[in-house]
């Protein structure tokens, strides 16, 4: 590359960096609301990448975290990389994430909320997708002063006297969720929920798509599949939460995906009903969106607009 062309490219890069800086400044100088995004099983903070810019452009701050064992914190079972896959070995290979518990997850959410406060946020709303509803609940149960709102997106959550896993045993959930057949190992044996994100089996990939993302573009879903990791700790679903008094005052919203084949709609309704019974002074607002489980990929703009309305 000659010097003149290099300078043109450098100038273009500087302009892009300046534009990015303007977006960041807008996010900080506008609304004092920050959304702390918490992903679900097998995902990472990257999964909010189509939602965050919309909220940033509207003037809101966002913090998307990687939970322990996920995203850049992921650890892979040794048998996962061997192809062709030894299915029997993969099904019994203990998960390197088996020792991660809900305290680890909740601590990561608290750190995310503290980062938002340190950046100037006067209002912090934690958004948990799917499994992510569990750690945002535990984080707010222990540190309610950090959170002004909790948003459950197609999520599971504990309530007093009932762990999140209890909702997986509901008749409609157990009968109609499509996710169970996609698990390739017994969670009790390996200590995790395991899927094969590198599978080339068309039937298996079709099963995952039906369960998680029936309405997501195939090209985008292929990219998502390359970013997913195979394991998610299972112990968190059996842990009971202890709720501080301040939790009852936190505004709660449940966004239910009406085409969800993973956390079926009736399960979301049951969680909301139990929350309202536990904390009648601050009822949980139930909002429906026509989407599969992976709403952040299927309907990112609609989801972002719903969240902006809660700021």
Q: For the regions a protein language model found, what residue spans apply to each?
A:
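C-terminal segment of N-terminal export signals and the immediately downstream linker at the start
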Residues: 1, 22-36, 40-45, 53
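Conserved alpha/beta-hydrolase
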Residues: 56-90
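Conserved hydrolase catalytic core segment
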Residues: 127-160
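Conserved loop-alpha-helix segment in the C-terminal half of the alpha/beta-hydrolase fold
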Residues: 258-288
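Catalytic active-site module of serine/aspartate enzymes centered on a nucleophile-bearing elbow/loop
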Residues: 285-311
